[in-house]
């Protein structure tokens, strides 16, 4: 009788990304930050990012790519996948996070950081021709994310702040 080998567990900190094969699962915790997962079904390889802001803007010259920024994190993942012979158009994308961590402090009409991050992720995948298979974006509170690279599944558990009537919400996406 053969036993399924337990995957190697990787935890992403903000500003990190990881590219892996089916022997890994990648986890993180998101507030206003966003994670993009990319999965290639034929090779069972994937990537996940944890970015803080959509872009670094024009204030600093781009010396090297920095995964703290959504546009650069996606470029880094696509470069690594391309090195493995995986075209971006054959990947399946999923997006998570963009929560509003301070709902009482939002000015009327202003986009919060989480909203900007989530919208940037959707735009980035669309611009690269990567289909978005599912998403769990926005809302209040933080999310715990687990990406099983062996099958492309992502578990998302949203935790609402104390004092909200929504409670916890967990989904397999």
Curated annotation (Swiss-Prot):
<dbReference type="InterPro" id="IPR011324">
    <property type="entry name" value="Cytotoxic_necrot_fac-like_cat"/>
</dbReference>
<dbReference type="Pfam" id="PF03975">
    <property type="entry name" value="CheD"/>
</dbReference>
<dbReference type="GO" id="GO:0006935">
    <property type="term" value="P:chemotaxis"/>
</dbReference>
<dbReference type="InterPro" id="IPR005659">
    <property type="entry name" value="Chemorcpt_Glu_NH3ase_CheD"/>
</dbReference>
<dbReference type="GO" id="GO:0050568">
    <property type="term" value="F:protein-glutamine glutaminase activity"/>
</dbReference>
<keyword id="KW-0145">Chemotaxis</keyword>
<dbReference type="InterPro" id="IPR038592">
    <property type="entry name" value="CheD-like_sf"/>
</dbReference>
<keyword id="KW-0378">Hydrolase</keyword>
<comment type="function">
    <text>Probably deamidates glutamine residues to glutamate on methyl-accepting chemotaxis receptors (MCPs), playing an important role in chemotaxis.</text>
</comment>
<comment type="similarity">
    <text>Belongs to the CheD family.</text>
</comment>
<protein>
    <recommendedName>
        <fullName>Probable chemoreceptor glutamine deamidase CheD 2</fullName>
        <ecNumber>3.5.1.44</ecNumber>
    </recommendedName>
</protein>
